[in-house]
Every structure is written in structure tokens, then in C-alpha cells.
């Protein structure tokens, strides 16, 4: 099982959960799917920023060379077929359809709101509390993310509808202040689907949408079917057998610190033999990269010709023309294979022949992060009844 005793995050001090909220609709148990949408627009990225983001998200100190690389002026202008589009999920928040990021590594539902200056909401859908919305007097929230972005504001109880299932008194965290990073992002906010114990609302944390609607679902599960360079799907209340091959392999979840934590039992690089070793980590749709123990990362890049751990670029890089090996994670006997092309994250800057690796070190975090580089290779079942995680190849 995963141990997170070294994790030092302020929100872990919040232990009291908000009461479960009503779910509208009939007594019939529900199932539904959420299709991500392709949000067009050119987005400029520095690959090292994503690495720094992930380290900071979990309280790790970012090495100086990664900080320097993340702050560098070099950037990547995304292309239509690879990195140019952001995939978001349309969700009805108090009568407004908002495109939100779904993040299994956090537990807040926060959105752009009319409490922000209009100059900061251009291009975004905005949540407007109505006469039926209930302001929670004395309640507030504040979140800081890895890239230095932040948001804070007030808390309302309002209805949130996803796929025909409505939580009629869902805690909606309405942004009153927001940093420029969010203003420039196409997302209208975030829906966290980790466990409610790490919701950041004070003085009393609130339940996630998933926790609030579980009793109205046919099964207390949601499934992530993320895709490589394409929109994915989230299934709620059922497991779609048409989206995976073979059987689903389950492993226990340690949710003691609010995350979907699990332990892998080994790995393999390319066609090499399996190395048996315990890898404790979490499944996080809100992190781009796959972060693993440095010893494993070194062994992977030892098989990539021309690779190096670059102080200039803040992580492992290699010639974009290099042939990468696949990477396999062993979970309860199941071998989850990540295709080689997934592991080339992006060029380090526009026009460069040097690429940034999708696997980087988890140094300083205390556990590994199985982010989108890994998750989009699998159909992943988040099952609250165990709790447990299930994995099957797409």
C-alpha cells in the first residue's frame, strides 16, 4: 500500500467533510459518458514548466536547474495535430455550460465567476449565482498550482449537472481573484475527482461531485478513457467493455491522504526483462508527465541514444529523431504498456531537434505520479467501492 507520510501540503489539514448533498432525478440508477471537447487555439508551452508544475503540486522542492529551464524564454508553439488543442469537458454549473478540466489529483470544483473583473474573464464562460444559489457565509477557498498560478474566492451551493445527473446543492467555488495564467488558458475551471478529504474549502471541506452523486449511479465508479492526440471520454456509473481489450485488473487504493494511490510491483524497458520493485504512486489526470523514481528513469534513458539529463532544459531530453523504447508498468501481475510514441512529450522549443521526455524523476515528491503519459495508454476504472483502481489496455 502507498505511504504518503512525507507529503506536506496545507490542504491535508482539512479533515471534516461537508454533508452529502441531494441528487435530483428519479430513483433509477444512472450511467452516462462525458465526451471531452477539442478547444482550438494556439498555446505556447515550455516543457520544463510541466515538470516544475507536477513537483510543486505535491509539495516537492523544484531543483534550481528545472526552475531556470521553466523560466527560460524558449517555448513551444503547439501544432494542430499534436499539442495545439486542449481537451476539456462541458459541465452545467448553475445553468451555465462550462468547459472544465477533470483532475483526479485534486478535490475542488472551482470556476470563473461574475465576481471577477470583466477584463479577466474574456473568452471564458462565467458562473453567475442566481437567486436559487446559496452563498456559504464565512466560507472561502484558495488554491495555488505548480506554475505559480492561483485562484481564490467564495463558495456557493448550486446545482451541477453532468450527463443528466444533478447534484442540487453542490459546493461551487466561485473565483473572486485569479492569476494571469488562468486568464490565458481556455479552461473555465476545474472539477476535482480525488477524495473529498482534501477539498480546500475552509472552515469545512466540501464533498466532490462524484461523492455527492455516487448513490444515484448504477455503480460507484467513473472511468477515464483518455486518448493520444485526440479527445477522450469519462464514463460514470459503468465500465464500457467496448473501450478496452481483455479483462480489467484491479489493485487496492490507499486513499489515506485523499489521492487515488496504488503500488505497482515492477517495470520493464523496451523488450527487456521485468524488474521487480515496489513503485508507490497516484493516478492523476491533472498531471501531464509520468514521474518515477530517478533510478528507473535513468535506466529508461540509458536505452535512448543521445539522451541526457539536461540542466539547460530542466529534465531528460534526447534527439527528436531518436528511437524510444516502450515502457511497461506491472500492476498486480498485469503489464500496462505505454507505447513509445507517447513518451516523446514535445520539442524543447519551436523548431528544435531536441525533445523533452514524457518520463521524468519524482525526486522530492515522496511518491510517483502516473499522469496522462501513462493514463492515456489504459482504460482506467476509479472504483469507490474498494476503493480500488482497475486497468485494461485500450
Curated annotation (Swiss-Prot):
A GO MF term: aspartic-type endopeptidase activity
CDD domains with a match to the protein in the record: Aspergillopepsin_like
Catalysed reactions, semicolon-separated: Hydrolysis of proteins with broad specificity similar to that of pepsin A, preferring hydrophobic residues at P1 and P1', but also cleaving 20-Gly-|-Glu-21 in the B chain of insulin. Clots milk, and activates trypsinogen
InterPro entries: Aspartic_peptidase_A1, Aspartic_peptidase_AS, Aspergillopepsin-like_cat_dom, PEPTIDASE_A1, Peptidase_aspartic_dom_sf
Main location: secreted
Propeptide: 21-70
Alphabetic keyword roster: Aspartyl protease, Disulfide bond, Hydrolase, Protease, Secreted, Signal, Zymogen
Domain (Peptidase A1): residue spans on this chain: 87-392
Disulphides: 320-355
Gene Ontology CC terms, in alphabetical order: extracellular region
Major enzyme class: hydrolase
GO BP annotation list: proteolysis
Signal peptide: 1-20
Catalytic residues of the enzyme: 103, 284
Subcellular location: Secreted
Pfam families: Asp
PROSITE patterns in the record: ASP_PROTEASE, PEPTIDASE_A1
EC number of this enzyme: 3.4.23.20
Job description of the protein: Secreted aspartic endopeptidase that allows assimilation of proteinaceous substrates. The scissile peptide bond is attacked by a nucleophilic water molecule activated by two aspartic residues in the active site. Shows a broad primary substrate specificity. Favors hydrophobic residues at the P1 and P1' positions, but can also activate trypsinogen and hydrolyze the B chain of insulin between positions 'Gly-20' and 'Glu-21'.
Family in the record: Belongs to the peptidase A1 family.
Subunit comment: Monomer.
Entries under PANTHER family matching the protein: ASPERGILLOPEPSIN-1-RELATED, BETA-SITE APP-CLEAVING ENZYME, ISOFORM A-RELATED
Name under which the protein is recorded: Penicillopepsin-3
Organism of derivation: Penicillium janthinellum
Gene: pepB
